[in-house]
């Protein structure tokens, strides 16, 4: 039986990394099926209650959705208009994905109150793809590689023998470790500060530290709503402080009005094999994560977690996870995944009705259609975002360690971890080790996530030790 981690009391509750923890965790506190529900899966709450529940879910996911495009745009040094559009499309695509997941269109979707949003797990490989060939290469790789997750949904029981909790934990840890350098770079002021010589200035580092400390303070509050909103509060106060220091200029927002038109392939599409392979590995992991998230959601919603109904629900949810990521690529956005923090929100509100998901989807789509929304967040100074993401990325790595720790660490597991972390971190710390390889191989293995993840899969399959 899958269990619901008690990490809700820590940073993992709100951050997107929380979804990484519900994969196949063992030895955590269990949750009684459907305990404390006011409205079940197919109930229709009154409109006012539905809207209120939807807004609470929206609060828990909004920052998580807009942060990946902001980080990717910053790393690729994209202009303000492009960054704003990517943020808007992330909201729009998340709305479409959430509707499909909740509604279940044919075999696609789980039919639960399951919220999807832009995934943190893909940031590293996406940045690598963007540096290789720009946005067209990113979206091409996202679309093609998503077929891996859709295929896994059809052969799920076999895949779980390859992507074990140990392998998942290693990959999740590497994802967090590889992203920490992105977060600390933002704390110093990002690419703009590096270009103008102000990187590491006291105002940048101090602003990032302020946001970080505020998040910690509010996260430790005994008030559950303050705890859930800790990242939002930290970012808002940091943003206001940056404005007071003259670090924000809102004049650009005034020149953008009207609506965003979600034009497919606005930035073109191209294909790079190394980028596709790098993203495909992450899709393998997110498929297994989606299985855990759907199981936990079913349990909390009082639905079966075994039998034919559950198998169809899990397969449909994973299929939707891949399909929605492909759809996001069509609409100039990045891969989506299920947000497990919303499972905690179901417990808090007692509302498991999937009809709430329709309202959440509608809110996200509407927000994505207004350019000013994306632009306001695009103007957020990098140190403000860096203070929050540094903590988020650290929790991703910590979540991976917890997944590993839930398993028996025998001689084989020790060897698998040693090889995976050694190879994965080596190419991150000393990228020149690959300088003599052909371009295609160098691009594939330059990502620590890809190198370490493939090493973990192969080592776990091939190493045999008699205890």
Q: Where do the language-model regions lie?
A:
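Hydrophobic alpha-helical transmembrane segments of multi-pass small-molecule transporters/permeases
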Residues: 50, 54-58, 142, 166, ...
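Membrane-embedded alpha-helical modules
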Residues: 129-252, 359-467
């Amino acid at each position: 039986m899958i269990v619901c981690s008690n990490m809700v009391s820590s940073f993992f509750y709100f951050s997107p990394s929380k979804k990484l923890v519900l994969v196949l965790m063992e030895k955590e506190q269990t949750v009684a099926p459907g305990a404390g529900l006011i409205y079940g899966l197919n109930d229709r709450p009154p409109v006012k209650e539905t809207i209120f529940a939807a807004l609470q879910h929206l609060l828990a996911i909004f920052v998580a959705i807009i942060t990946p495009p902001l980080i990717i745009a910053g790393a690729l040094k994209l202009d303000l208009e492009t960054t704003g559009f990517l943020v808007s499309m992330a909201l729009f695509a998340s709305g479409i994905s959430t509707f499909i997941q909740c509604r279940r269109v044919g075999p696609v979707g789980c039919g639960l109150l399951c919220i999807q949003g832009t995934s943190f797990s893909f940031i590293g490989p996406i940045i690598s793809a963007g540096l290789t060939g720009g946005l067209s290469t990113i979206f091409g790789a996202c679309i093609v590689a998503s077929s891996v997750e859709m295929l896994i949904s059809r052969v799920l029981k076999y895949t779980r023998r390859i992507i074990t909790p140990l392998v998942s934990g290693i990959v999740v840890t590497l994802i967090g470790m590889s992203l920490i350098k992105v977060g600390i770079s933002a704390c110093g002021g990002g690419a703009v500060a590096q270009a103008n010589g102000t990187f590491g200035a006291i105002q940048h580092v101090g602003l990032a530290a302020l946001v970080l400390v505020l998040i910690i303070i509010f996260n430790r509050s005994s008030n559950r709503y303050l705890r859930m909103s800790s990242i939002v509060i930290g970012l808002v106060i940091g943003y206001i402080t940056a404005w007071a220091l003259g670090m924000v200029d809102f004049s650009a927002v005034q020149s953008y009005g009207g609506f965003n038109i979600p034009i497919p392939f606005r930035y073109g599409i191209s294909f790079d094999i190394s980028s596709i392979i790098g993203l495909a590995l992450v899709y393998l992991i997110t498929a297994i994560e989606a299985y855990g998230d759907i199981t936990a959601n079913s349990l909390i919603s009082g639905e079966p977690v075994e039998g034919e109904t559950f198998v169809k629900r899990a397969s449909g949810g994973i299929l939707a996870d891949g399909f929605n990521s492909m759809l996001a690529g069509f609409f100039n956005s990045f891969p989506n995944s299920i947000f497990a923090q919303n499972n905690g929100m179901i417990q808090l509100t007692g509302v498991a009705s999937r009809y709430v998901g329709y309202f959440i989807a509608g809110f996200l789509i509407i927000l994505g259609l207004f350019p000013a929304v994306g632009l306001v967040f695009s103007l957020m100074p990098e140190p403000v975002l860096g203070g929050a993401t540094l903590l988020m990325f650290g929790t991703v790595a910590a979540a991976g360690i917890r997944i590993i720790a839930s398993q028996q660490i025998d001689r084989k597991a020790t060897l698998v971890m040693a090889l995976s972390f050694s190879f994965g971190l080596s190419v991150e710390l000393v990228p020149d080790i690959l300088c003599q390889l052909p371009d295609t191989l160098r691009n594939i293995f330059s990502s620590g996530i890809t190198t370490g993840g493939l090493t973990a899969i192969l080592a776990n399959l091939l190493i045999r030790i008699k205890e």
